[in-house]
Amino acid sequence: IYPVPDHSEMLFSIQSDPEETGTSVGIYFMTDPMPMNTLADYRRKLIMRFQDVMFQQRLVELTKKEDSPVLFARPIEGHFVRSKDVHYVGAWVKEDQVEQGLEAVLTEIARIEQHGFSEGELARAKYQGKRFGEWWDQGDKTWSDYYVGQCQSNFLRGDPILNHEIERKLYEELVSTITLGEVNDVLGDWF
């Protein structure tokens, strides 16, 4: 495992690609890897999933504002390398409004840090999570890359491989126990 050193200062890079047709900005927040071995670890994963769903909805609302410099934005939580986990926020911005687009995304992150999410946002995220049930019901139609990702995580990180029935049971057992306070507390782990 090659370690990625921690740092207190912001690191940045400006890149261009003549073949790229759009302009984007990306922000990476790195942490030490979080284990996935216990029920508590899986519960934390659900909390983070809800946080991502709510953050995604905030970013969608940002793109709908009149004259928004952001065309599309998305948060992604995952593994960067084996020695670091990452929370990534990517935004596709108007060509001539890169700084304004980055500022808009950072402003939304600051707003979330300061005020957190609301009960209504969490209720909507939990409702959307129930739609996973439709996906779990179609396990025989799941793309193989889902299983490849599970095998990779198991081999590289020791994460368990969960089948659809187990994952559905865990979700249904845990979803009602997750509180807004817990979701808002996890923000401090990322931002």
Residue ranges of model-derived segments:
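Divalent metal-coordination and catalytic microenvironments
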Residues: 49, 105, 183
